[in-house]
């Protein structure tokens, strides 16, 4: 018997920036027992992220920006080193990530390669992230990057070996970034 889910109630607790739901549902377990659950679910939309790499120079492009949630959770400066990313906002993932790459890093990338889609925090967050990589070159630099409007983004071009070391030292603690850097290492796109 497969599990069945019956929605009992979906109450919106907040929709100031993203939407926080309080969801009550019945879950019919495999043994037939029905269990009522009440959970908060945070809907922030789906997103996309991309790691830019240069195989010849053996470098990657990352960004550093303030992330309030990390600051609240003990990251004293709130600064996080991560891959370029953004919410889809009704765009297709590839369209989104091309826009974000130009806005945040300044690079207008050519061919992008989609790797996978992952739920990063499925216990309470709806977001599905689309993961991409793309090779970049210096002549693809369209502007200085840094984000738009209220963003204050620092663009970092780092040796790939240094970025991997920064995972070990704790300087890089963003999940999507660690995944993409490890993927790049395992795939031997930079040797």
Curated annotation (Swiss-Prot):
Gene3D superfamilies, per database record: Nucleoside Triphosphate Pyrophosphohydrolase
Catalytic activity: GDP-alpha-D-mannose + H2O = alpha-D-mannose 1-phosphate + GMP + 2 H(+)
Record Pfam families: NUDIX (PF00293)
Enzyme class: hydrolase
Motif segment (Nudix box): 86-106
Cofactor(s) needed: Mg(2+)
Keyword match Hydrolase: yes
Domain Nudix hydrolase: from-to ranges: 43-180
InterPro entries with a match to the protein in the record: NDP_pyrophosphatase, NUDIX_hydrolase-like_dom_sf, NUDIX_hydrolase_dom
Binding sites annotated in the UniProt record for Mg(2+) 2: 100, 104, 151
Residues that bind GDP-alpha-D-mannose: 17, 38-40, 67, 85-87, 104, 127, 150-151, 176
Residues holding Mg(2+) 1: 85, 104
Subunit structure: Homodimer.
The name this protein goes by in its record: GDP-mannose pyrophosphatase
Native species: Shigella dysenteriae serotype 1 (strain Sd197)
């Amino acid at each position: 018997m497969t599990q069945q889910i019956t929605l009992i109630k979906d109450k919106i607790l907040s929709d100031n920036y993203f939407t926080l739901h309080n969801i009550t549902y019945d879950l019919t377990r495999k043994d037939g027992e029905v269990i009522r659950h009440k959970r908060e679910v945070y809907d922030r939309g789906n997103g996309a992220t991309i790691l830019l790499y240069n195989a010849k120079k053996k470098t990657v492009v990352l960004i550093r920006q303030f992330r309030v949630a990390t600051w609240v959770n003990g990251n004293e400066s709130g600064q996080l080193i991560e891959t370029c990313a953004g919410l889809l906002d009704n765009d297709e993932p590839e369209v989104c990530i091309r826009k974000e790459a130009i806005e945040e890093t300044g690079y207008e990338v050519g061919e992008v390669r989609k790797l996978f889609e992952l739920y990063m925090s499925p216990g309470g967050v709806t977001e599905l992230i689309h993961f991409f990589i793309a090779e970049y070159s210096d002549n693809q630099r369209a502007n200085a990057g840094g984000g738009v409007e209220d963003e204050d983004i620092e663009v970092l071009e780092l040796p790939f070996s240094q970025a991997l070391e920064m995972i070990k030292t704790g300087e890089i603690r963003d999940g999507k970034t660690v995944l993409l850097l490890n993927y790049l290492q395992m795939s031997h796109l930079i040797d």
